Amino acid sequence: MSRIRFVQLNHLRPSQQRGAAAVEFALVLIPLLALAFGIVEFGRTIYHYDAVVKSVRAASRLIAAYDPSDSVSFSSAATQARCIAVFGKTSCQSGDTPLAPGLATSHVKICTRASVAECPDLQIADVQNVSTGTGTGTVQLVVVRIDGYQFGFLGLPFTGVGTSVQFNTISSVMRGI
């Protein structure tokens, strides 16, 4: 009967195994860094999306305080609302930094029943407030939205992965005066 012989797999001396852990660490570090960068970039995207949503809400809150039938004051308020939506303040200067990179006042659309040209896909009507019986009459709705905004990623240059994502339409509807 033959005897079974066990072969020792770890036949290298410790002095010959130096650096093996460093090589393994380097091989694992590359995907871990890419994963960490992706997580940070995803968080950055969510942060900018939230900033844009809040600025649109603030712009609609401002424009809702003006009567759309008064074209002079409403036009001035619309300009201020566009500045709030993009820059976070009521006045725009040429050197101002937008809240999100690439955001411009041309992305902001302000729509009311009287001015539907900027939002042809919306049907805005005054809402008759008859259910309460208080006699408050009609309620004017104001819509502020951002269309076509593309958020640019920092990106990993060697991957060739997409460098931007287009956000869906971000809108806020408020009850006007």
Language-model regions, residue ranges each:
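Alpha-helical assembly-interface signal, strongest on the long, hydrophobic N-terminal helix that forms
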Residues: 2-86
